[in-house]
């Protein structure tokens, strides 16, 4: 193949600004293929309550504010830039929803589908002009409802390819996708035991063309255990960071099964995310002692920053991996 440039991003968590930057990224980085490696949606919906007199009540990052009509659009943009969603509603609607857990969940599912659909439509409008492909999958923080939405949205698309627990091809490359994670303290929607990860990933690799592992990118949301890209703060029983000498104590939180399977199958590259603060590139030795590169682009979605990893590939393999931030 001719020299190819691929942009890898992950963990955008619904950030309106990060998605906007992603829509422009292929022109900036001169690439015709993008991988979005999971955690697509936001964390919560922030209600903006109409007081009935052209003012609104809203709690922004813990601070209650009363805003005017002419401040509404800017407030929505500020909130959604950092990965939260917004919903403007009347006092009556807010009272009804806030006292009913089912209605809260229904609202969140409705809003996250609408917002993700809007972000993907913005991307499609730009990528389709230059025939750029985006390989996408949900992560552990995305609901199974979003997993189904992504499958439906991408079905028949010329721009998007859903790779969650699937195999796709791009020219001579083979991509495997797996968006679940191991168990976390946060009890997120798509977590599995190590045994289940091992079983399902083995099944996925077994379905692939194993003679093409030297041209295979394994897109696995959770990083492999005991690497430079799986370090997160150690937490106490009440989920507070452990501090020693004024610094947070870091520990490996990646998947042992993912590491074992990379050692076993030896793909060309492992692409990961999940641990926002562990951007970087590391190497795992397979069973023949060959080094397999694994990367995590990291995430600063809450600041509207798009972090990435720009890959340069040629017939001989990976020429360069450059971490990006913009």
Where are the language model's segments positioned?
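Active-site-proximal beta-strand elements of phosphoester/diester hydrolases
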Residues: 3-13, 172-184, 217-221, 292-299, ...
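Divalent metal-coordination and catalytic microenvironments
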Residues: 11, 19, 34, 39, ...
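Active-site environment of divalent metal-dependent phosphoester hydrolases
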Residues: 13-17, 41-45, 137-148, 168, ...
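Binuclear metal-dependent phosphoesterase catalytic core
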Residues: 14, 166-171, 192, 264, ...
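Catalytic phosphate/metal-binding cores of nucleic-acid and nucleotide-processing enzymes, i.e., regions
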Residues: 16, 20, 29, 242, ...
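Core catalytic region of metal-dependent phosphoesterases/phosphodiesterases
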Residues: 18-170
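Active-site-proximal segments of metal-dependent phosphoesterases and phosphodiesterases across multiple
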Residues: 102-113, 217-266
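Binuclear metal-dependent hydrolase catalytic cores centered on His/Asp/Glu-rich metal-binding motifs
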Residues: 171-216, 237, 244-256
């Amino acid at each position: 193949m001719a020299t190819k440039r691929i942009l890898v991003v992950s963990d955008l968590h619904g950030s309106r600004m990060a998605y906007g930057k992603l829509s422009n990224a292929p022109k900036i980085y001169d690439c015709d293929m993008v991988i979005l490696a999971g955690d697509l949606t936001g964390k919560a919906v922030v209600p903006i309550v109409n007081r009935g007199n052209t003012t609104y009540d809203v709690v922004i990052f813990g601070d209650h504010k009363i805003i005017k009509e002419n401040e509404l659009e800017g407030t929505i943009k500020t909130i959604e830039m950092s990965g939260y969603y917004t919903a403007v509603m009347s006092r009556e609607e807010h009272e009804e929803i806030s006292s009913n857990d089912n209605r809260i969940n229904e609202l969140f599912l409705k809003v996250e589908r609408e917002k993700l659909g809007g972000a993907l439509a913005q991307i499609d409008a730009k990528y389709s002009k230059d025939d750029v492909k985006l390989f996408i999958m949900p992560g552990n923080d995305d609901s199974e409802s979003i997993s189904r939405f992504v499958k439906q949205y991408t079905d028949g698309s010329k721009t998007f390819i859903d790779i969650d627990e699937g195999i796709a091809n791009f020219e001579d490359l083979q991509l495997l996708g797996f968006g679940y994670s191991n168990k976390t303290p946060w009890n997120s929607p798509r977590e599995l035991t190590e045994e289940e990860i091992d079983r399902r990933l083995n099944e996925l690799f077994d379905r692939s063309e194993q003679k093409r592992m030297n041209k295979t990118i394994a897109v696995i949301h959770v990083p492999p255990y005991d690497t430079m890209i799986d370090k997160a703060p150690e937490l106490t029983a009440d989920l507070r960071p452990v501090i020693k000498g004024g610094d947070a104590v870091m520990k490996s939180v990646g998947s042992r099964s993912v590491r074992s399977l990379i050692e076993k199958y030896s793909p060309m590259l492992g692409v990961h995310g999940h641990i926002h603060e562990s951007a970087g590139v590391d190497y795992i030795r397979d069973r023949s002692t060959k080094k397999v590169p694994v990367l995590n682009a990291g995430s600063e979605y809450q600041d509207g920053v798009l972090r990435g990893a720009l890959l340069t590939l040629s017939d001989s393999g990976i020429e360069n991996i450059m971490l990006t931030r913009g």
